Design a protein with these regions (language model features):
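Thiamine diphosphate
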Residues: 1-232, 236-238, 242, 251, ...
């Protein structure tokens, strides 16, 4: 069989099989036994998640005030370092291994690296290997977390993450620099398809937090929750999201709940559903619409792979739904909401606003505006939807 390409993906038979098994030191009867066992395999083979109980302290959430403006990746890094310090060297605590591919400063895992050096694994520019090693490590009694740019941590290594799903690993992937928000890095580095890629799997959970406060809580939740979980966030600094009274929306009493939509502003003249950092432009558009006598309901969806049925029902009752996202409009939030509406048999005016081509290179605001996704574009499109 050596040096014969015919055997790529093809099993040896007859005398070739007998010789191969003898050379390997196995009985040739194993082949027949395997064929018999196949007859007994159920139609659906269950996935068995990696064994083990997570014993890790995630601590109290940091609180970012209404006057704070910072990036979600820094909030993630701060929360990660907090958790590391609470557990590093503590007997009986599940180790938290953090993997990096030469980007610790950009993805904000450098603080963790300084505080917990033995738990920090620098892999170099080896994304495929890192996805595999981090997934495998999570089945060995540790919590694995890998932070990288969106195009490297998911687009580049999609098959490895698909195999992590098949193998039931316990990996936490944090994607920074996603969407058009990356701006100057241009179309090659603007990850605009992460929700669609993870929707192709059956076990991955996805969280796209709105601001630093929600990012902090989602990070701590992901670390202590079994299973494969992805957090996705942009690069830009964001204001803390507030309620109508000016208090942080995700304040001290807020607890992250996977799949729960966030009510940002009350209203009844249609519903605007935002994902991730776009909710900040959504608030600006909402204020403009209210000044013009239109008061829509404003929602934020941080978990686009999981529908909040109660929130969707309330949105339908307003008579019009517009989704707003920094993501491929055909595979992200819009498609998720539209499919669920169709499955429920709902009749409602609907429009999806999202990325519809590869982006340009420039400031985040300029690139988003050139895609027709500015807050002014949102106001205009929403008014057109109501007029239909």
């Amino acid at each position: 069989m050596e040096n014969v390409p015919d055997y790529h993906g093809k099993a040896a038979t007859g005398q070739a099989y007998e010789r191969a098994m003898a050379e390997l030191g196995f009985s040739s009867s194993l082949g027949g036994e395997a064929m018999e066992r196949r007859k007994e395999v159920p139609a659906t083979v269950p996935i068995h998640p990696c064994p083990g109980t997570i014993s890790i302290e995630t601590g109290a959430a940091r609180q970012y005030g209404a006057d704070v403006k910072t990036d979600n990746r820094s909030a993630f890094g701060n929360a990660l370092e907090d958790v590391g310090k609470l557990n590093y060297g503590e007997l009986g605590k599940t180790p938290l291994l953090v993997f990096d591919c030469d980007l610790a400063g950009s993805v904000k895992t450098d603080g963790f690296a300084r505080s917990c050096p033995k738990w920090f694994k620098e892999m170099g520019i080896q994304e495929h290997s890192t996805a595999t090693v981090a997934g495998a490590a999570s089945c060995g009694g540790v919590v694995s977390l890998w932070a990288d740019f969106g195009v490297f941590g998911l687009d580049e290594v999609y098959n490895q993450q698909r195999l992590n799903d098949i193998n039931g690993t316990n990996l936490k992937v944090v994607l920074t620099h996603v969407g058009l928000d990356v701006g100057e890095d241009g179309m090659t580095h603007q990850c605009i398809d992460y929700a669609g890629l993870l929707r192709n799997t059956f076990g991955w959970k996805l969280v796209v937090p709105a601001d630093p406060n929600q990012t902090d809580r989602a990070t701590r939740w992901a670390i202590r929750t079994p299973g494969n979980i992805c957090l996705a966030m942009g690069r830009s600094k964001l204001p803390v999201l507030t309620d109508e009274k000016g208090a942080p929306l995700f304040g001290e009493d807020y607890k992250f709940q996977y799949g729960k939509a966030d009510l940002v502003r009350e209203g009844s003249h249609g519903t605007i559903i935002c994902m991730g950092h776009m909710v900040h432009r959504g608030v600006k558009a909402w204020e403009t619409l209210v000044a013009q006598g239109i008061r829509p309901r404003l929602l934020h969806v941080s978990c686009p792979l999981e529908t909040d049925e109660e929130a969707l029902e309330a949105a339908v009752r307003t008579g019009a739904i517009l989704t707003y996202e920094d993501h491929h409009s055909g595979t992200g939030l819009a498609s998720s909401i539209a499919m669920r509406l169709a499955e429920r048999g709902e009749t409602v005016r609907f429009k999806g606003m999202g990325v519809h081509r590869y982006g340009d290179s420039g400031t985040s605001d300029d690139v988003i505006a050139r895609m027709g996704l500015s807050s002014a574009d949102l106001v205009m499109t929403f008014k057109q939807l109501l007029a239909r």
